[in-house]
């Protein structure tokens, strides 16, 4: 995997900054709830990727 794969796109950087600004003045309780929701979404994303990889046909490269 290329090191650039771990960089954010311009759009992702913009969205990240927008989230930082939007969450700057929330309570600790709200921040914890957002963290729990984000963790759940990351787990779902992992499950979807794993399922898609299982469904993908394996073909030789070249």
Swiss-Prot record:
Gene3D superfamilies: Phycobilisome degradation protein NblA. Disulfide bonds: none annotated. It comes from the Bacteria. Pfam families: NblA (PF04485). Coiled coil: none annotated. Transmembrane segments: none annotated. To Synechococcus PCC 7942 NblA and some, to chloroplast ycf18. This is Phycobilisome degradation protein NblA homolog 1.
């Amino acid at each position: 995997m290329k090191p650039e794969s771990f960089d954010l796109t311009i759009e992702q950087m913009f969205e990240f900054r927008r989230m930082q600004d939007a969450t700057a003045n929330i309570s600790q309780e709200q921040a914890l709830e957002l963290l729990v929701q984000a963790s759940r979404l990351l787990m779902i994303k992992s499950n979807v990727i794993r399922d898609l990889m299982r469904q993908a046909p394996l073909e030789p490269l070249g």
